[in-house]
Amino acid sequence: VFSEVAPGTYALTPVSNLLRSDVPGSLRAMAVMVTTPSHWLPWGRLEETLRKGISVAEDVFGKPLWDYFKDNHEEAAWFNGAMTSFSGLTASVVAEAYDFQGVQKIVDIGGGHGFFLSTLLRKAAGAEGMLYDLPQVIQTMPRLDDDVAKRITADSGDFFRAVPEGGDLYTLKHIIHDWADDQCRQILTNIRNAMVEGGRVLIVDAVLPPQSSPDAGFLMDMNMLAMTPGGCERTEK
């Protein structure tokens, strides 16, 4: 992690440099988040989760994880910061790979603080963006200071009840993997009912290979097992 450049003198390496908060691609928030009680407490009872076949996270916190974050603002801030960091690993790849021609309105469901949506809007010239998340997330959203901020509006609510109407592209980055199949169907049904005719849904999640192999998606799958009531990474099938 660190390099000894002289006896008793140490310097950052490319790895430890990512733990700074002021560098491109910083993973500081991610590193801190996984050491907070919101993560290490459920992971500490992973064996119990495996034996029961369902996450014990709600037993640990006495409430759903999202309600826990609502009551623990510091940990929620680290989580939201980590999700922004995570977006930095995927947003530019998605923006380059996807054809945004003709897209008029992107609605980012569970979009956190807007980094992913902002990145897509830089590629989708002329499109408007709607950021949709829980009230406590939208309320703590930092000011977006780049040129796409004026094209973004924000709204809050519960995506199990409804989502903003009128989008022709709805994005779900690392949302579907948080929930069991029935809950995912409800989210997607609400999107279908809200989108314009001919609208599309873009889901960004890990896709597991059909057979066990050294794939980072399996670690994420374990994290979903530990942290969520029914969430998982899925295969293409």
Name each model feature, range by range.
Residues 1-105:
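Conserved Class I S-adenosyl-L-methionine-dependent methyltransferase catalytic core
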Residues 4, 100-237:
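Alpha-helical subdomain
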